[in-house]
Regions:
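Positively charged N-terminal leader segments that act as targeting/secretion signals
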Residues: 2-16, 20
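Active-site environment of divalent metal-dependent phosphoester hydrolases
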Residues: 44-47, 84-87, 124-126, 157, ...
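Conserved, mostly hydrophobic/aromatic
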Residues: 40, 69, 150, 173, ...
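Catalytic pocket-lining loop regions of alpha/beta-barrel enzymes
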Residues: 148-149, 162-278
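Mid-to-C-terminal alpha-helical segments outside catalytic/metal-binding sites
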Residues: 9-12, 27-76, 266, 270-278, ...
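Acidic/histidine-rich helix-loop elements
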Residues: 44-60, 91-92, 187-189, 249-253
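Active-site gating/metal-coordination segments in enzymes
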Residues: 90-196
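Divalent metal-dependent hydrolysis catalytic cores, especially in the metallo-beta-lactamase
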Residues: 54-56, 63-92, 115-122, 148-149, ...
């Protein structure tokens, strides 16, 4: 599908006109200055993402994502590894990588400079017998500067995050100071198993590996109370607010679902640790301009800079060396 970007911009402009005058002034003031790091998106060339992107008003292409970044002052993005065809080098289970710009080149990085990646884990293929060799597979990429973390997919993969088959990867994460992002909460597939994706399971791993940073992706949606408690209790646990919505939510959706966002706000305020929250989109799932606006209503204005930018630099520490003066 060919996206008409002029029409898309008109739709966004109409959306902003509907906002209160004070909100318009705030958006204009922040939009001109505030840098954004998207701490959770996908950069995966797969047929299903074409439909997902179209529903959000986009194309699932590298060019489209770059235009989104230019329009929204997104200076860096963390892409979650999704590919399944990475060859094995050491007899272990290879990681999942990214490939939207081109098939991944593990010798000369051929994805955009403003995108880093988390190594995706195929947990159900790892055993206690091959876990050590799997860690070697991951270490090959962990030595590369564009690798900024590790991503585990409980729920989509019927394995708990704290399962001992993951322990060599946690040791690797500790050695290379890489955070471990963990899918939690709702899944896009009815074949998934929700019990593996409950945010309370992250507490087990975080307590066993206190020197490793863990990220509760999607704030455990809809288990916000549990997710914020785990982050409040564990100094090494953080939260991203990616993927809470999909398609083009718009202001009408926000108004109709205000109770949902109020509930989220209650638990974020209960936690009271705005330094532990990161912006993420889960692109191509959602329209970026609308999602940024809605999360600005959830996170207090005085914490926008750390939420949209600074906290990701702390959690995904390698980003600092990849920003190229952006």
């Amino acid at each position: 599908m060919q996206i008409d970007y002029n029409q898309s911009c008109l739709r966004r402009a109409f959306f902003i006109v509907l906002l209160p005058a004070d909100d318009i002034m705030l958006l204009l003031k922040e939009g001109a200055a505030m840098k954004i790091i998207d701490a959770h998106m996908h950069y995966f060339n797969i047929e299903g993402f074409k439909t997902v992107a179209a529903n959000a008003g986009y194309e699932n292409t590298a060019a489209c994502w770059q235009q989104i970044c230019d329009e929204n002052n997104i200076v860096f993005s963390v892409a979650m590894g999704n590919t399944e065809d990475v060859p094995s080098r050491y007899g272990g289970i290879s990681p999942r990588l990214i490939d939207l710009n081109a098939p991944f080149d593990d010798v000369k990085y051929n994805q955009p400079d403003n995108i880093g990646y988390c190594l995706g884990v195929k947990s159900e293929q790892i055993t206690l017998e091959n876990a050590g060799k799997t860690a070697l597979e991951f270490e090959y990429y962990a030595q590369k500067p564009q690798c900024v973390g590790i991503k585990i997919y409980p729920g989509y993969r019927p394995v708990y995050v704290y399962d001992k088959r993951h322990w060599p990867l946690f040791e690797l994460a500790r050695a290379y100071n890489l955070p471990v992002a963990v899918h939690t909460g709702d899944t896009a597939s009815s074949d998934a198993r929700l019990k593996y994706a409950h945010p309370l399971t992250v507490d087990e791993a975080a307590a066993d590996f206190p020197d490793v940073k863990f990220v509760i992706c999607h704030c455990g949606n809809p288990w916000f109370a549990d997710a914020t408690e785990v982050a409040a209790k564990n100094p090494n646990v953080y939260i991203d607010l990616s993927g809470l919505l999909e398609s083009i939510p718009g202001l009408d959706f926000y108004n109709k679902q205000k109770a949902y966002f109020d509930y989220l706000s209650i638990w974020l305020n209960y936690m009271g640790r705005w330094d532990k929250l990161m912006y993420g989109s889960d692109w191509p799932l959602v329209n970026i301009a609308d999602y940024i606006y809605i999360l600005k209503q959830v996170v207090p204005q005085e914490h926008h800079e750390e939420f949209f930018y600074g906290n990701a630099l702390n959690v995904y520490g390698r980003i600092k060396n990849l920003l190229h003066d952006c």
